[in-house]
Amino acid sequence: MNFKLILSLPILCLGLIWPLTSHAADSFNILLYHHISSTMPRSTSITSEEFEGHLEYLKINDYNVIDLASAIASIQQGEPLPDKAIVITFDDAWRDIYLQGLPLLKKYDYPFTVFVNTDPVDQNNRHTMTWDMLRDLKKQGVTLANHTRDHDYLVRKPLYDEQWLDATLDNINYAQQRLTDELGPVPKWLAYPFGEYNDQLKLALKNRGYIAFGQQSGGVAEFSDWQALPRFPAAGRYSNLQSLKTKLASQPLPANYTAFTNPVIRTDQGDQSQPLLEVELTKAQKLGVRQQLSCFIVGERQMPNWQSKMNFTVQAGKALGKGRNRYNCTAPIWGQKNYYWLSHQWLVYGGEAPPKE
């Protein structure tokens, strides 16, 4: 398997990357939440107090929280975004979003989007919003979108054959129809359960007019992959405001994201679980001290191995564990205290039964 990333970077000078613009008006960052609760699993939860702390920070630091539809339209139409643009999203339509999150978001007058998996709503799951609650959200201007019908693992399957693809698309289309039947027109957006996808699924969604969202970190710009848009997780261990501040202020590293390699590593089919990223700089004109570009793999720092003035590689120092892993790369923006950010998620899968998450 060829693990090649072709990046389009601005000029590097003294190890720092020159900014493309004076501000981030051509990109925006998306925050991802699940539960707003002190009793649900901590890994996907943030307390009401922590969540309000995030909202207050956005307010006092002049971030512009905008709705996702407007943000996407501005990028796709080449129109400027507000400076420091942020979008708020939730996955899974948990009831605590309605009970705990909605009052706070109304207090700050912040728009948001909820990605809904429809089966739990149909089954009257006590932890999930009802259709009446979702209708009330839509009436209040909240955007509702597709998170599949059952939150299944979409790509942890033995074979990626036509039968698999048809079943996966049926799942997505069923949820889209249920949302439309109950709520009226909804956008053709999909949030991948667990942020997991492969190239076949991305292409099928592109051909059917979907925009899709992962759970890898980073911002959104015109050069993004519209079937794998990144979002910054902001709950659980990612809820710490000190670390979140850096992410909020970051800009997406300019790159050809659609050229990123298939993120699924099939160890049962001979794929190696130490994937190598081969990075080609395409707009660098001058390269000075190179140490300023850093990558982090499963929490460990990995410096790039420079092959030439235009090429470097990054590889995990040891085999990645089963499940989801990320390569994150950052570089300081010249003249600013902020960073460019790039993330690529790998799924190491050997055909085993998926875990319960």
Task: Report each predicted region and the residues it spans.
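A short glycine-rich beta-strand->turn/loop micro-motif centered on a GG-aromatic cluster
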Residues: 68, 114-116, 212-220
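Catalytic-core region of carbohydrate-active enzymes that cleave or remodel glycosidic bonds
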Residues: 174, 179-183, 206-217
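Terminal accessory/targeting
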Residues: 1-84, 106-112, 118-129, 162, ...
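Metal-dependent polysaccharide deacetylase catalytic core of the NodB/CE4 family, i.e.
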Residues: 26-43, 82-86, 94-96, 100-200, ...
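Short histidine
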Residues: 144, 213, 218-253
